[in-house]
């Protein structure tokens, strides 16, 4: 699949029509009324253009960060050409009419520059412009499926109008071509990535396989699919096959942009020692009986693939760790080495376990090992992808992997990183944590 970034945008303004001229994107004035009218549950909407000099602006909780991309011609996700706008992202924020944040187990409201972990796969990069829409949904629907769904669907009105403009641009606007290839490597160790996504209902849901990258049209909610495993290609993942609705704790939330830049998928694709055959998305139901029903489907699906090893990842922590552990068990009991990746540390410590959970990678970056409500802080990054691949290779080779300590010890991570660096002869760049950000009032009062 080709990604063709249109000229990096320097400015975004509101004007009479939505269009792109040179390095400037114009968004139609009055489009807010159409966003509100699109969904009965949307009661108010405000559109802001946030430039880098305005990062110290108050915002309600960030529900999602999305790339702006569209398919060329009749191309479908994972194939053909995709046009991408660089230098700008869509950002959805919101509350209900009572002022309650659309989030659960924490929220990221506050000054943007104090509550975003810049550069995380799912977060904005410093220097980008935010097309930020703040939606107000009907009171008390913030914790129902229909509230967040209405917010995301209405906000996509603006993104889709931009996509339609992008389709009409001539090739002079293309400044860079990036080719993404999914190369199979017969004879190498075949591996699969299982990504557990939220599916408990209420706000915990995702749209899968829309027509447009991170779009709405044509997508199916994984809750409506029964949360059963859905197999996709690595390129479908990187082309925006997941529109994330989940509003779990901000620090471990995988936003739509996270899948667009999914680090483990990218690391496995580029690793010449493994053969990445695909990615399996599986929802996390609310009821335990449904969790085990779905988990058995995961085990059979992975067994049918005849893989040599597997990864199981999850966002969030707590309830979803029940099926996270069960996925690992169902794969492991079939004689397949499996590495689990999750935020654990102190606050996300696993509530369940089994004998197959011997190969684990912790996504924690926070200083205290907690959900600190800083967007993206504890999400899977390249460094976890590198560690997980090294661990799975060791497991597939039958090498010893030491048992985890009973209590969280951040030195385990640094020791493993040093071992991998010594073996591979290259430096692993570790990302910053919340200590690199200006101190927010919330962090000062609650965490630090």
Where are each of the predicted segments found?
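Single conserved hydrophobic/aromatic residue that forms the stacking wall/gate
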Residues: 1-13
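Conserved, well-structured core segments that form the ligand-binding/active-site neighborhood
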Residues: 96-267, 352-448
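General beta-strand structural signal in soluble alpha/beta enzymes
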Residues: 277-278, 340-341, 439
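Short glycine-rich or small-residue beta-strand-to-loop segments that form or flank ligand, phosphate
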Residues: 51, 193-194, 308-315, 339-342
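Long, well-ordered mid-to-C-terminal structural blocks that present hydrophobic/aromatic surfaces
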Residues: 233-322, 327-329
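General structural feature for long, well-ordered alpha-helical segments within catalytic domains
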Residues: 19, 27, 77-80, 84, ...
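An N-terminal, globular interaction/scaffold subdomain
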Residues: 11-160
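Internal alpha/beta domain cores that form substrate/cofactor-binding pockets in large enzymes
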Residues: 285-295, 301, 305, 319-349, ...
